[in-house]
Amino acid sequence: MGRKWANIVAKKTAKDGANSKVYAKFGVEIYVAAKKGDPDPESNTALKFVIDRAKQAQVPKHVIDKAIDKAKGNTDETFTEGRYEGFGPNGSMLIVDTLTSNVNRTAANVRAAFGKNGGNMGASGSVAYLFDNKGVIVFAGDDADSVFEQLLEADVDVDDVEAEEGSITVYTAPTDLHKAIVALRESGIQEFQVTELEMIPQSEVELTGEDLETFEKLYSVLEDDEDVQKIYTNVDGF
């Protein structure tokens, strides 16, 4: 599993580096986190968490700073979180998280993306029950047992710790992700490849041929929507 996360991170980072839409999405997320609390990340853990993720995606510093400065201003722009669930070809499923200033626009766009690209949007809860909400942390290392013990000593609710090909992957209860990051930093680990709240599928499907092509198009259209923040799926490799 550690290799899977590393591969996904490498794939996304390569795309993110040339994708200004990703920067814009993080800009919105940073703005919202800063607006909800203190614009200083040292006293706003939610903001610091988003900034750390943005840095992992190679978002430039000026994008981060601009979003924080915007939150410090007098703008009244508001954003609403949303979640949509749906189905793609041959047993594939998707959960789409959004952050938008226009809920009606976003709902229509997501529904159209499913309908025009071989998918079907489902009702709330139609997919999510087949996924588990977990915190995921990935960093360089090979001693899973030691990391597990450190996190238990820090009273972190740990689901699992895996070591594979020089990477450690930690799975935590979603409420303990930040606590786990703090504990790992205090133990001397400063560089993380992944620090995310994830919806992890209880089982995966592997798509090939036309099914894979159809799914890739559906995924791409959703990902390109400016209001879509994250997509979770049960398709292997995504």
From Swiss-Prot:
GO biological process, one term: regulation of DNA-templated transcription
Family matches, as SUPFAM superfamilies: YebC-like
GO MF annotation terms: DNA binding
Keywords: Cytoplasm, DNA-binding, Transcription, Transcription regulation
GO cellular component labels: cytosol
Origin superkingdom: Bacteria
Main location: cytoplasm
Gene3D superfamilies the record matches: 1.10.10.200, 3.30.70.980
Sequence similarity: Belongs to the TACO1 family. YeeN subfamily.
Name of the featured protein: Probable transcriptional regulatory protein SSA_0586
Organism encoding this protein: Streptococcus sanguinis (strain SK36)
Lineage: Bacteria, Bacillati, Bacillota, Bacilli, Lactobacillales
